[in-house]
């Protein structure tokens, strides 16, 4: 079972970093650079996750997915969204076939 509270603690830290000096905080520097910089990090971590998977490197898959989740959480926070928003969407989709879920999307 996933420890959802660790995600909430990370989210709280990310919120605090919005107020931090960009020269003293990596996350604050990402926020200061804006959406493009954050998206670039998410894309970079997604690519690294794919490379680890293609290499069948289990340890690196976990490391890279952790980095991907982290930077995805930075992106969520940047837009005023939270882990709870994502969890709510997972709950909404639970038990729905992927094909049916995609058909239900408006765009």
From Swiss-Prot:
Its main location: cytoplasm. Signal peptide: none annotated. GO terms for molecular function: ATP binding; phosphoribosyl-ATP diphosphatase activity. It is found in: Cytoplasm. GO terms for biological process: L-histidine biosynthetic process. Its EC number is 3.6.1.31. Keywords: Amino-acid biosynthesis, ATP-binding, Cytoplasm, Histidine biosynthesis, Hydrolase, Nucleotide-binding. GO terms for cellular component: cytoplasm. It catalyses: 1-(5-phospho-beta-D-ribosyl)-ATP + H2O = 1-(5-phospho-beta-D-ribosyl)-5'-AMP + diphosphate + H(+). It comes from the Bacteria. Pathway: Amino-acid biosynthesis; L-histidine biosynthesis; L-histidine from 5-phospho-alpha-D-ribose 1-diphosphate: step 2/9. Belongs to the PRA-PH family. This is Phosphoribosyl-ATP pyrophosphatase. It comes from Azoarcus sp. (strain BH72). The gene is hisE.
